[in-house]
């Protein structure tokens, strides 16, 4: 906390955007405890901010400007801490603050300035939260006292004072948070400034057309994602998805800076190699046809089984996210805690097993030595992952009644995520979709929806765009319904046989809900009431 006091004590600080997700609240608590003269401003009124305001009652010195922003709160500030949802470009209040000499920060940038912890970071379009959560879980399973923070979890300012060089931190970072870090770096631009964000290990999940109601085009969206690895160097590692068309570009750019690139794929190495480059599998993780995951840690290494097939999360998409997180955790362990006396063959005893026989090429590589994580780490992690069930709102199995199994995938806010949810199940499912449009392409979803046993639509602007596409594809549906309660009551009346019900909206939530988490919580609550 001494560093924080040196940075903030006695300074006039304005927090722009309190919100209700915790980031603004954490920043306010942190700054107040560091001795800042603090103003919190938000365009929403006090009623909309009740949960956050209740927490801040413990800090009576905080001044609030609610329901509006005032220029004087920015012109008189030494530091402005902005919420990621606030657009920085052409914002009159942030411009006024900068003209007056104020620094623009975020909760993430403050954390990166103050924490001595080794950093692992995750970004991409979908799968960020699942991957980051599985990575933190894997690190803890290996004995590291890891923290998890960022986009969909707690602000890292909640735990920054507890971090040390021995406590790895996993940050999940959205495109908006990454864009803010680039802007902060631009303020700090000197010959010695190397960028605040430099994760030892970074994972890029697949890129999809997300937030296109915010960005001018895909290139500007992807440019923000590239901040994830922009300042990595020769001692750092980037995991790229070999099934993603953007993966080769990310890998090429990172390798120019000497970054070590690992590939991961939900396919066999032969299929993935055709999609990328012939040298893709020098360092890589892939999925065998029996559901096991195999890895090669360096060119010439023997392939070794990393993850046995007992994962409980459904579908190859989620399972590949968990496997990539496990690989990242093992790479971190390799760098930080490998005992010198252990033999490192991972599961090399299984390298000639029937699982590997699914591949065209026999495992004729040299047995890995210094490049592979040690056997006890791999075994311990494999055992721990057998009980890993994923996280809330991401294909979350939460209820079963009368032969009906319910999955909450409310964090699915783009059509591609819903398509992936459909493909996660071997059986035909009852699918619930619909919500608020983000200028996405719904044609592929309309075609994929034909695979569903039944389709229910929740009302919204995205649903209005989807309906004519469903008609054109001759896909029948029920709805649209203006509430989850009415939708589920109709579903219960119609559903006479056992089956799987998946709520995977494929759209944003804002016309009916505050955010996707409220949407998912409402769905679970209504299911338990209606199907009791």
From Swiss-Prot:
Catalytic activity: UDP-N-acetyl-alpha-D-muramoyl-L-alanine + D-glutamate + ATP = UDP-N-acetyl-alpha-D-muramoyl-L-alanyl-D-glutamate + ADP + phosphate + H(+)
Record InterPro entries: Mur-like_cat_sf, Mur_ligase_C, Mur_ligase_C_dom_sf, Mur_ligase_cen, MurD
UniProt keyword annotations, A-Z: ATP-binding, Cell cycle, Cell division, Cell shape, Cell wall biogenesis/degradation, Cytoplasm, Ligase, Nucleotide-binding, Peptidoglycan synthesis
Protein's pathway: Cell wall biogenesis; peptidoglycan biosynthesis
UniProt EC number: 6.3.2.9
Uppermost EC category: ligase
Binding residues for ATP: 124-130
Gene Ontology MF annotations: ATP binding; UDP-N-acetylmuramoylalanine-D-glutamate ligase activity
UniProt subcellular location: Cytoplasm
Record-level GO BP terms: cell division; cell wall organization; peptidoglycan biosynthetic process; regulation of cell shape
Pfam families the UniProt entry points to: Mur_ligase_C (PF02875), Mur_ligase_M (PF08245)
Domain of life (superkingdom): Bacteria
HAMAP family, A to Z: MurD
NCBIfam families the UniProt entry points to: murD
Family in the record: Belongs to the MurCDEF family.
Role noted for this protein: Cell wall formation. Catalyzes the addition of glutamate to the nucleotide precursor UDP-N-acetylmuramoyl-L-alanine (UMA).
Name by which UniProt lists this protein: UDP-N-acetylmuramoylalanine--D-glutamate ligase
Species per Swiss-Prot/TrEMBL record: Treponema pallidum (strain Nichols)
């Amino acid at each position: 906390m001494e560093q924080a006091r040196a940075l903030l004590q006695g300074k006039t600080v304005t927090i722009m955007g309190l919100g209700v997700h915790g980031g603004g609240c954490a920043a306010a608590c942190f700054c107040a405890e560091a001795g800042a003269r603090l103003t919190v401003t938000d365009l929403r009124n006090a009623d909309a901010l009740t949960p956050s305001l209740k927490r801040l009652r413990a800090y009576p010195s905080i001044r609030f400007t609610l329901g509006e922003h005032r220029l004087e709160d920015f012109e008189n500030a030494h530091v402005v801490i902005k919420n990621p949802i606030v657009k920085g470009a052409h914002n009159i209040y942030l411009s006024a603050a900068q003209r007056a000499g104020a620094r623009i920060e975020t909760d993430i940038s403050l954390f990166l300035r103050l924490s001595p912890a080794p950093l692992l970071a995750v970004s991409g379009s979908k799968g960020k939260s699942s991957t980051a959560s599985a990575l933190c879980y894997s690190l803890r399973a290996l004995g590291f006292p890891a923290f998890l923070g960022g986009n969909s979890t707690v602000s890292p300012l909640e735990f920054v004072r507890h971090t040390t060089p021995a406590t790895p931190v996993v940050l999940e970072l959205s495109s908006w948070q990454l864009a803010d870090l680039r802007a902060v770096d631009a303020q700090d631009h000197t010959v010695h400034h190397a960028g605040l964000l430099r994760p030892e290990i970074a994972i890029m999940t697949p890129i999809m057309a997300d937030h296109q109601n915010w960005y001018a085009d895909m290139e500007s969206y992807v440019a923000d994602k590239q901040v994830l690895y922009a300042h990595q160097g020769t001692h750092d590692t980037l995991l790229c998805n070999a099934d993603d068309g953007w993966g080769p570009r990310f890998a090429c750019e990172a390798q120019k800076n000497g970054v070590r690139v690992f590939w991961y794929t939900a396919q066999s190495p032969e299929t993935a190699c055709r999609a990328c480059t012939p040298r893709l599998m020098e360092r890589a993780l892939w999925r065998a046809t029996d559901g096991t995951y195999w890895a090669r840690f360096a060119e010439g290494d023997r392939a070794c089984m990393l993850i046995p097939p007992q994962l409980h999360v459904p579908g190859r998409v989620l399972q590949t996210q968990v496997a990539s997180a496990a690989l990242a955790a093992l790479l971190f362990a390799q760098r930080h805690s490998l005992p010198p006396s252990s033999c490192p063959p991972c599961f090399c005893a299984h390298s000639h097993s029937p699982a590997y026989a699914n591949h065209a090429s026999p495992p004729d590589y040299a047995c890995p030595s210094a490049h592979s994580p040690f056997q006890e780490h791999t075994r311990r992690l494999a055992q721990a992952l057998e009980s890993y069930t994923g996280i809330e709102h991401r294909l979350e199995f939460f209820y079963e009644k009368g032969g009906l199994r319910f999955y909450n995938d409310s964090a699915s806010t783009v059509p591609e995520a819903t398509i992936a949810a459909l493909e996660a199940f071997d059986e035909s499912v009852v699918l619930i979709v619909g919500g608020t449009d983000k200028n996405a392409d719904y044609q592929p979803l309309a075609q994929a929806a034909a695979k569903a046993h039944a389709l229910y639509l929740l009302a919204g602007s995205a649903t209005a765009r989807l309906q004519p596409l469903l008609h054109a594809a001759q896909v029948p549906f029920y709805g649209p319904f203006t509430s989850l309660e009415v939708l589920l009551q109709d579903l219960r009346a119609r559903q006479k046989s056992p089956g799987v019900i998946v709520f995977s909206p494929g759209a944003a939530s804002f016309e009916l809900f505050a955010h996707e988490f409220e949407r998912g919580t409402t769905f679970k609550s209504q299911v338990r009431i209606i199907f009791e």
